[in-house]
A protein has these predicted regions:
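Basic/polar N-terminal segments that are highly enriched at the extreme N-terminus
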Residues: 1, 22-27
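Bacterial N-terminal signal peptides
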Residues: 10-21
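Bacterial N-terminal signal peptides that target proteins for export
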Residues: 1-12
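Flexible loop/hinge segments at secondary-structure junctions
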Residues: 26-317
Length: 317
């Protein structure tokens, strides 16, 4: 009789486990593959999100490759990847082709020079006027550092831009009312490549996403580079209200509060071909917009507002 009671008890426990335990675990487990390609700007953040998501869902494989926003949108629309990483606004013609953007975070593009630039004192104290930037990258009228920043001598400016179709160049050009193809300079592939080109050239000037101008661990400017402050009010000097470039944290706060202009601040997107149908992709996107947001600031990005996040979540329902 005693053994019979034990057997019945085991059966009941097994039944309850199968009913309430195993099924719940099975429901919570997520499996599948997710592929992303595109913007260098979003690449470090996407890698961090993938790492954290896989800790919770080891059955999910996430493949990520960088190559510029242009590649990301093309790969997404041709179903080469599940999602394209895009660091610019989505064009109307891309929307017509099926592009379905979900904003996931914000960052910005900044001008950079070599830390050994002979005109560095003038650059840092006077800042980059919008007119000066326009005459460096758009018209090409400014050929020397003296013309651009009022320093002495006739030392030439070596101008760099991006060779790949990318959000950083598109947003930097938009700051001057133009498009990427209007930017002048020696073309360099990728964010890391452009940063390296300026680091190697004491007379070089370029632009980078903030994740490549600052060290995400120390929050300081990358060794060998200096971020050029924008003379936002155009008074020929960097005032206290415009001086927020020493650390990544200060710049992020300036972007979040609107002190830093937009553009060159902008939202970053994950884009699918049509509204996402693949379950693992939808779950990853929803996680990014909820629990995944806690990793945004530590990775050197800016969180979206609660209103914006709720709007993006609604797009996935």
């Amino acid at each position: 009789m005693k053994n019979k009671k034990i057997s019945i008890g085991v059966l009941i426990v097994t039944f309850l486990f199968n009913l309430f335990g195993f099924n719940v675990i099975a429901q919570e487990q997520i499996k599948g593959t997710i592929s992303l390609s595109g913007a260098w700007a979003l690449y470090p953040m996407a890698v961090k999100w993938a790492e954290e998501f896989r800790k919770l869902n080891p059955g999910v494989r996430i493949d990520i490759s960088a190559g510029g926003a242009g590649k990301g949108i093309t790969d997404a629309l041709t179903n080469m990847v599940d999602m394209g990483m895009v660091s610019r606004e989505i064009y109307p013609e891309e929307i017509k082709k099926g592009a379905y953007p979900v904003a996931v975070t914000k960052d910005a593009v900044v001008a950079v020079v070599n830390a050994s630039n002979p005109a560095l004192d003038a650059i840092m104290s006077k800042g980059l006027k919008r007119e000066a930037g326009n005459n460096i990258w758009i018209t090409g009228m400014y050929k020397t550092w003296a013309q651009a920043f009022g320093s002495k001598g006739s030392i030439p400016i070596h101008v760099y831009t991006r060779s790949d179709a990318c959000g950083a160049a598109e947003v930097w050009a938009k700051y001057y009312g133009k498009k990427q193809e209007d930017l002048l300079g020696s073309g360099v592939y990728g964010d890391p490549g452009l940063a390296l080109a300026v680091k190697k050239d004491p007379l070089g000037i370029g632009f980078n996403n903030i994740g490549y101008a600052y060290d995400s661990k120390t929050k300081k400017q990358i060794a060998g580079l200096r971020v050029v402050p924008l003379d936002i009010n155009g008074d020929g000097k960097i005032t206290t209200d415009e001086n927020f470039y020493d650390t990544m944290d200060k710049l992020i706060e300036a972007i979040a509060t609107g002190k830093f202009p937009s553009p060159p601040a902008r939202e970053l997107y994950l884009v699918t071909n049509g509204k996402p149908q693949k379950e693992v992709v939808k779950k990853f996107l929803l996680w990014i917009l909820t629990d995944g947001q806690k990793f945004v600031n530590e990775a050197g990005y800016i969180s979206l507002s609660k209103e914006s996040i709720n709007k993006e979540i609604e797009k996935l329902k």
